[in-house]
Amino acid sequence: MDQLRQSLLDAPIIEKGEYQYFVHPISDGVPMLKPELLREIVIRIIRKAELENVDKIVTPAAMGIHISTALSLMTDIPLVVIRKRQYGLDGEVPLFQETGYSESEMYINDVEEGDRVLVLDDVLSTGGTMKAILDALTDEVGAEVVDVVAVIKKAGENELDDTDYNVKTLINVTVEDGEVVIVDAKGDD
């Protein structure tokens, strides 16, 4: 069960401006996502996350969808995708998302007051997306966030550091001198 670690060590690195960025099947959809890697990740999430009495898995589009779908299939917990497109459905809640890379609006549908949710995403980097989602779910919708999981955490400060939100991760990494460095192979609890 070391596919995630090895896949990160093998990940190609690209440069975007002054930023070194790893390209990984979980966070980018390329290179190809092998089923054994996805299976390992879902098993590790099931072992780490608080799933008892969770009503819904909530994930932002787009790169949380494949992980959350696999988790939903394994746990029979319904999946809600926070979309980047507004549909105008009853109960739709907009949220403003700002990361180190972009700004946009996202829209929550099918999460109601009192719902107990697991929030799941592929990567925790600046924390902007995750913080906006958690704030909207708790403050605007009135959902109870039972647990929060990000598969990969990029080392460094993020917007959740000084909040009450606890994000569990499966592995923590950084990029140094054109290579992925494993900071914590077990992630955060």
Swiss-Prot record:
Keywords: Purine salvage, Transferase. May catalyze a purine salvage reaction, the substrate is unknown. It comes from Halorubrum lacusprofundi (strain ATCC 49239 / DSM 5036 / JCM 8891 / ACAM 34). One of its GO terms (molecular function) is transferase activity. Belongs to the purine/pyrimidine phosphoribosyltransferase family. Archaeal HPRT subfamily. One of its GO terms (biological process) is purine ribonucleoside salvage. Its EC number is 2.4.2.-. InterPro entries: HGPRTase-like, PRibTrfase_dom, PRTase-like, Pur/Pyrimidine_PRTase. It comes from the Archaea. This is HGPRTase-like protein. The keyword Transferase applies. Pfam families: Pribosyltran (PF00156). HAMAP family: Hypx_phosphoribosyltr. The keyword Transferase applies. It is an enzyme of class 2 (transferase).
